[in-house]
């Protein structure tokens, strides 16, 4: 009985140690960098190009960069954590201003619900605090 308990404890320990390795797969930024990154394939090419142009124009007019990312899977992350990590990894926004916004969309799948999150750079938190970003998602 004790050996069975030890085997079970070792198996649980190995499973727990492997968790951080599973939840590490954030996508690399496309090359050349884009503002619309449709990894889930939700948009057709015309929609993607149209949205990309609108976001480029918005960036040019306001110096605020908005990046849209769609993914099929959050790889074990909570939506907020995934979006923030991706926001940081890609460096969304102007250097020194940290004024970027990352909009994350994970569509529903047969085995999971759809999720979305808006990650706002520190330079914009006074304009778009987390509560406002949450309300935007709730209304849409």
Where are these regions (language model features)?
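Positively charged n-region of N-terminal signal peptides that target proteins for export
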Residues: 1-6
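Folded, non-transmembrane soluble domains that reside on the lumenal/extracytoplasmic side of membranes
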Residues: 24-140
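Bacterial N-terminal signal peptides
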Residues: 7-20
């Amino acid at each position: 009985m004790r050996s069975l308990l030890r085997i079970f404890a070792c198996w649980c320990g190995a499973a727990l140690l492997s968790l951080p390795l599973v939840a590490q797969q954030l996508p690399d930024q496309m090359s050349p960098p884009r503002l619309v990154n449709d990894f889930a394939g939700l948009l057709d090419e015309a929609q993607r190009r149209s949205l990309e142009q609108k976001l480029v124009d918005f960036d040019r007019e306001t110096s605020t960069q908005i990046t849209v990312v769609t993914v099929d899977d959050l790889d074990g992350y909570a939506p907020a954590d995934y979006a923030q990590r991706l926001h940081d990894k890609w460096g969304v926004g102007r250097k020194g201003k940290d004024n970027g916004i990352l909009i994350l969309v994970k569509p529903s799948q047969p085995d999971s619900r759809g999720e979305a999150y808006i990650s706002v750079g520190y330079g914009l938190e006074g304009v778009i605090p987390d509560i406002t970003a949450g309300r935007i998602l709730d209304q849409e």
